């Protein structure tokens, strides 16, 4: 579920909620400063970068690079997403272990945390099929909403789609993607592996955005959420803003 509202000052606020058939909710929301926050299992909110860090991007640099749209300034330095920069300014954690402990303290207030107990709680919360179940319909909806076909359709590519193994250009930059182009990409197999599908688009204002998609090749019986789902969900929200 994705939603948008206008606050009393006229700011656009965005939200996203992943509600499994069984297990912890993941809620994203933005504020007037365009800081992105996450609520896990309907608890108090955290900067969304805490979740990203807990998933394995444990340095500020790796998080900035993850969402970087590839653009540079006149000196050739990366121009990072200001929304991620502002969110990192609210994030007091500096490593994956610290992020896991911070999440643990929100979910289990009053209980003394250790890195091991925090990691076990996090893994059990999302990646244990006995505790988390999207159901087949939930996996279908995530694959459709966050998969590369849905995200690419109707967009104008800012960079070419390239087969990294052969160097072959599958689609050129500047192409507006329709069903025919989607079929060309699908036939090429460039997004048929594990992990993310990533590409870059140019919107109607000429702004370049990086699109991060989940692994939509997962079968419908894969009912736990994945780290690719979580990152793709944040990417989707950023591209609504």
PLM region spans:
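N-terminal non-catalytic structural scaffold regions of very large proteins
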Residues: 1-241
